[in-house]
Regions:
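Terminal targeting signals and extreme-terminal segments of soluble enzymes
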Residues: 1-128
């Protein structure tokens, strides 16, 4: 049983049915904010060119934004999601996702996420 908020969120993440989350970890949570890392590899996460498939960054962004929303005590479903790919990423890269809740309304929420590579370079921007 979790004894900290961070442990609790990682226990919830482990119950996620998407297989890629096995390589992810929630590294920080506070009200309206969450951070995650994802260890990628070149066999499960890449397209035929060896670049990360687009679904990886947007999936990480969706997960970290949902976690940020959940820190405010709300269970959410994504109703709109967009992302901008800023830089190509090769398999084997550790990605870091940082999300913040921008709008905490009665019936909707809006969050933003930034995904960084190991060098701290921005590789993806998302809003949902």
């Amino acid at each position: 049983m979790a004894t900290t908020l961070l442990e609790y969120f990682n226990e919830l993440r482990n119950q996620n049915p998407f297989s890629w989350v096995k390589d992810s970890e929630i590294t920080a949570v506070e009200p309206g904010h969450a951070e995650m890392t994802l260890q990628t590899n070149d066999t499960e996460y890449c397209n035929f060119r060896g670049d990360l498939h687009g679904a990886v960054c947007i999936g990480l962004a969706d997960s970290v934004m949902g976690t940020a929303c959940f820190t405010l005590g709300k269970s959410v479903s994504t109703i709109d999601l967009n992302g901008n790919y800023v830089k190509a990423v090769k398999g084997g890269t550790v990605l870091r996702g940082v999300a913040n809740v921008e709008h905490n309304g009665k019936t909707t929420m809006v969050a933003t996420a930034r995904i960084y590579n190991e060098l701290g370079e921005l590789v993806h921007l998302a809003r949902g």
